[in-house]
Swiss-Prot record:
Residues 510-585 form the U-box domain. It is an enzyme of class 2 (transferase). The keyword Repeat applies. Residues 438-450 have a biased composition (Low complexity). Pathway: Protein modification; protein ubiquitination. Residues 466-484 have a biased composition (Polar residues). GO terms for molecular function: ubiquitin-protein transferase activity. GO terms for biological process: nodulation; protein ubiquitination. Keywords: Nodulation, Repeat, Transferase, WD repeat. The lineage of its organism: Eukaryota, Viridiplantae, Streptophyta, Embryophyta, Tracheophyta. This is Putative E3 ubiquitin-protein ligase LIN-2. It comes from Lotus japonicus.
Amino acid sequence: MAGNFRFMMDQKDIVRFLTTTVDSFIQDRLINKEQRTQHKEQCAERLAAEDGSGDKDTEVEYSDQAVLANLDWGIEALEEAINTYNMETKLARLDYAEKMLQVCAMLNPKQKIAGVPNSYLSAWAHLNLSYLWKLRNNVQNCISHALEMFIVDPFFTRIDFAPELWKSLFLPHMSSIVGWYSEERHRLMMEVIPDSADLSFTADFEQFFNESLVLTMRPHQLEKLQKLEQLYGESLDENTKLYAKYYNDCMNSDSSSSKKAVPMLPIAEPPMTPLHELSRTIPDFVKFGPILPKSAGFSLAPRSKDVLNETIRENVTSSNLKEEKLSIWGAKDTIIEENEDDSDSELDNESVDSDDKNNIFSPGMKMMKYEGVETKVDLSCQRNQIPSPDIFSPLDSPRTAPNNSSPNPDMHSKRDSKFLRLSSSRIREPTISDSLTSSPDISIDNISNADNEVMVRNNIKRKNDSQTPSMNQDNENSLVLNDSSHCESEDGYQSSSSLPKLEKLSMGSKPPKDFVCPITGQIFCDPVTLETGQTYERKAIQEWLRTGNTTCPITRQPLSASILPKTNYVLKRLITSWKEQNPELAQEFSNVNTPRGSSCSPSAKDIPMLSTRQRTTDSPNHKNKDYARQRSNRFMPAAITTSPTSVLSQAAVETIVNSLKPYISSLCTSENLPECEEAVLKIARLLKDSKTNPQIHSYLSKPTIINGLVEILSASRNREVLRTSIYILSELIFTDDSVAETLNSVDSDFDCLATLLKNGLAEAALLIYQLRPVFAQLSAHELIPSLVDVIQNKNEELDDFQLVIDPKDAAIAILEQTLMGGDEYSRSLNASSVISANGIPTLVKYLERMEGRRSVVSVLLCCMQAEKSCKNLIANRIELSPVLELFHSGNDSVRGTCVEFLSELVQLNRRTSCNQLLHTIKDEGAFSTMHTFLVYLQMAPMEHQLAVASLLLQLDLLAEPRKMSIYREEAVETLIEALWQKDFSNTQMKALDALLFLIGHISSSGKSYTEAWLLKIAGFDQPYNALMKVEQLGQHDNDLIETMEDEKNALNSWQKRIASVLCNHENGSIFKALEECLKSNSLKMAKSCLVLATWLTRMLYTLPDTGVRDVARKSLLEEVIKVLHSSKSLEDMILVTLSLYPFISDPTVHEVLRVYAKSIYRILRKLKKYSTVAADILKALLNLNSVDVTELWSCKEVVELDLSSNGEVLSLHYLNGQVLSGLMDGTSKVCDARKRIPRVIQETHEHTKAVTSLCSSGDRLYSASLDKTIRVWTIKSDGIKCIDVYDIKEAVHELAANDKLACYVSQGTGVKVFNWSEAPKLINFSKYVKSLAVAGDKLYCGCSGYSIQEVDLSTYTSNSFFTGTRKLLGKQTIHSLQIHDDYLFACVSSVDATAGKIFSLSQKMVVGSLSTGLDIHRIAINSDFIFAGTKFGTIEVWLKDKFTRVASIQMAGGHTKITSLVSDVDGMMLFVGSSDGKIQVWALD
């Protein structure tokens, strides 16, 4: 219908049509997983066929392997994205799949890779990219890739990738080409059919596509047909490509815009114009053009006529086996009326060549399907007639179940006789059309001349068949069925007397013999063909081998293979086809005699971990869910087999059952415990002797017997009986899952088993494991100590009984389930239980065994993740070779567990131990561990990529990273790429954790303490000290100094390597990623990112500059400043200051700091009391030439304390958060300055006259007064207390004291020194002293006459330190001295606009001056500023390091004289005492 309205569709309609059609096609593919899997297998078969046809000595280059691997990885990642429900994982796998598939999509289509056309790989990639964009809900890209697929490779897209889509989009446009081809083929076929002059073009048209006509062609006719089909296929391809480009232009063109030309509709022109209108009777497979079989690889044309003919014969045979139904979508267009004599017949004995199981036919040579025709087999062995041909197209799945109608019983005799005539008259080829055979123009006499030739071939075939009388298998999916008992006699003919026998053995009476297992007598559920050619039910042959037999049950040939082959899917499909045609008969032979524990039971495959001594086999991997085996829901009678080849005779079974009956009766009804115990032992013996016959198992699986065994477990105290009961139950569960369901239905049964396990019965662990309990059950019974005991202790062996699973293996599996279940708290608690039960050494030792190794690794991993402190315990005992062997041999899940385990294990608290462990990992194993990890990294799921990347990077950095390394590049790229996944916060967090652990600061408890270590470097060492205190308490070994030194050197070397690799990767790309992480709304992520960024910037400036510093500055500087502004955490702000510190020395940073200077200045002032780095940054900031300090300065008066009632404030002193004041009337007051607004908390009146001076040393306060005393005070949080009074007989005007002596100034010249015990000594230098300052054993005295005297307190001598230039007019006096950071600050009368000088005590020279026109009487200094108080109530403020004036503060009282000045220790507050008895408090923020 599309062909009728296609010319009336405008561009919008075409886009709508494309959207609907392609979207529907892609949606159907995404929904049908089985179809995708089947399609991938078929494409892989074509690749394999091409590989097999090439030169086997030719090596495939690594680059070619990489391209093919990328395609495979991309398809696998896409499948994972389709199957997962985790949106984070889905998007990540889609990104990875796109990256992999784009490699193949962009290949040059004109070239080849490993013999495979690039166009094929590119089209395959485009198909999967179309799936990918559909999953992303991007319809535009989805359609674009689907159309690109047809442009790149129209031929294989039409036959392999999207035949349904080609039919909908392109076939309606190809009618003229199909018409031309039909006419040309008609013309050729008219030359082949004798006396065909009376046939018109439309009469019997379908006969011209009959496959058998090709076989009658002459060589020159066959060559013409080949050229015709080649030209036909090329025409379809070219026009498909033309229309695909047109559709693509329509999708990309904007119909609403008139600027871009509207795409022109192309016209599909055939090589010649057809003369007749297209017939509706042309089958769809003709319209599809030539179709290349999968087994032909990519050879588009046969090499010779022989090859062509052989391909025809093989394809016809393949079609006979498949018995496909009509194309589900093309039936209406391809209906061919069936002849009354031509109906489908049933399949009996057939021969299938494994190479042809997936052949697809071309319209000229490989289209028609014939039931009942064989190749390479005696023709007279056939009992089926030749039916009318079915129609086949690429849309017919080779796995589609046939839906043929049942044959008419009245036609059997007629068909059989005809078949016999055809069979005996085949001469040139083994396939001739039924329609031609019935034609009157072809005489039987003309054909019968070849009877002798056929007879010779039949005899040869029969002799070959006699060597393998039943079946022969070449590979896991190929099967040849032979039945010599129904072939003709030795003279090569089959007599007509055999016809009744054929009818008697037809499908209507019983199943074909080859569909029935010779052991069980039942139709196959899971057939496997042994190396001897015999086929058995998988479960039956498993039990045959388990009983100790090593030969084939029928041929008695020894079996060399230890593992059963995979399911014979060819035979299984035939059986399924037969069952659908004969449902009643199939039900009779599948169910009636199938016991509950029959071969169809999948219970064996449900047990993932078995160590059963010749019992364990790989359960079949069913690729088609439609053929999944169904378990019976009720007990059935024992199967009765009458086959002469049956191994287990029914008489023997009945004998065992009769022997069991009295013991079963005792077990179920007796009240005598010893009698029941004896019955259990006898039942076990008989069960063992039955060689696990399924019928015996079914008999013992009755609920009453199960309950009797459980009662024995509850009542008996005999260990042998208990263990034997468990043996019986275990065997029954192994065979039939319903036994486990019976036990699980009663909670007390599990409680009984748990009690037995706790009482030391190791075998109870086996039964618990087989019952598959949930985590809640295991957790409720607290089985971990008992499970560890089972693993630790040597188990007693059961006499003559072999358990299906070793109890130790079962215990480990249960332990794994227990540790992996529950929440984080439960996992931690359970891991602690394993560690406290001393289970770690036992589990580590258990790794030597292959069985259960995966579970052991999983358990140890759970222990390390829950209790990181056990890593050292494991690392000191483990042998890593078993873990690496498990990694190399395991699947993706096992590899992921191994990688996580190794990644956790190397996170030790000692770098030297880590390196030793890494060397072991690197050197162990038969394969290159690093290369294996690299390959796994490229295909690992997201949840394991970070672990393997971290591990691979550490292995690579064991050597100095001087040269380029693909391992290092891939690992670092993976870690950094994870940091960019802002949509997946969990992945970002894991990446940050992995990078922090790479730094190497790991505590003995297994946690990273990089943050505490960085804070300690910044001067905030409380977190580090607290951590070390805990670590030392848990540390019992006394490390030698040499060992600690080696550890320190190893860690420093390691950190330099890590920092160099991370910083220099792709020109500092990690800093750009960290910039994004710092913007996260997650506080935890931002904190981890800040720690990592701080460490990297600190390490960056210890490495040679390669241009990365500029990248780090641009990426991080502004982000960390934002953190400084927004964070409320002290630790975060200190980390920011540490990260900023390296940038201060960079001139390019100064401009940025100028912008943020004012905002960060206040924060840094608050932080400097906690962090020395903050103080250093603040100092550097204030000294930057680009920063205007006057813009940073600000102050505010907080409060004014009015103490005027006590007179003038003569002295102030700050100590331990308190401000002490000395007043005119002798009162001393204490103010609490720990809060922003100080308040008076104490007032004392110890002195009777004015308190002239206050000073402190240590925790002592010293006060001097005009009352001729010096008092000593202790300072407490609530005030001061006088403890000593020294009466010195004279008034004291100035005091400097410590615990050894006191220096004071009285009325006369010089200074007096008092050592607290002897009489004061006068040091007279004939000058009046105005101020004092003490530094060590030196006393500096500010004297009249503009000079400073230096007194040596050890020798009591003095000398001149400084002498200034005196003026004739006015007095020049040094009013105040103060020492700060090895500098002496002197306040003097203003001379030449200079009123203060700064001296270096070490150099004894002037290093600066304070320029002001006012006399400075008092001075106060903090870490940043100098405050100078004048007598007119003004305080001048200077920058301490540069001695530049910043600002001035005017006292509120106007020109009040400033009598005292003091700043707090943090430099945040300024206290000013004045002559009017007030104390003003200023906040310097």
